[in-house]
Amino acid sequence: MKKIMYFLLIILLIVSIAISSYFIYKQLKEENEQESIFNNLSEIIQDDTENRLKDNLESNNYIKIQELYKENNDLIGWVNIENTNIDYPVMQTKKNEEYYLRKNFYKKYSSYGTPFLASSCNIDTSENLIVYGHHMQNSKMFGELENYKKEDFYKSHKYINFYTLEADIKYEIFAVFRTTLYKNNTFKYYQIIELDNEEDYTRFINKCYELSYYDTGIKPNFKEKLITLSTCDYTTKNSRLVVVAREIIGE
């Protein structure tokens, strides 16, 4: 009987190791595939830059994004924070906002997904653009937003670059905070997109300041457009980590 139990335990151990190895392999395979996709997209941009420079043409980032748009017309822009992993296309689908939550740039399943703009946002006119991305444990996608909880990281990574099909836009971060969804008394930042009223604008900014981990000293002025990066926060259930920045014009 003891020999049978011992044999069964060995079998269970082998099976559990095999299953664990499979899931690790699957995770690493997907991570490599996703990274390869983003690298290929970056190469399209780089190739376009080289070609335009050879022809003495303008090589602004928004012109490069237009090349990627030919690959997938759900592309709305590209978000970049220098010296971080955050360097990704941003998608938008009006009928199904979360379509890219589990889809890569080429519309194939991916647990990493692709950052996407809220469906209620208008890329040209909305005062607050809300971009969602996954918080991956390996710091990919919007995982590095976690670092903004530390003021020292913020000080060396103050700016968000957002390239649309029409323009290169630079934003300066002014607030970083955590909030919880699905509670009546929490800050529903994700519902605040149109801020053409000064009172509403000021109320939104003040709430961001109130919740922010630290005082950045940056004071957005009414009519300055905003961008909000949102990802999951694992501190508590249904938490979100939010980074908000104001558009820099003529600075």
Question: Where are these predicted regions, by residue range?
Answer:
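Hydrophobic membrane-insertion alpha-helices, especially the h-region
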Residues: 6-22
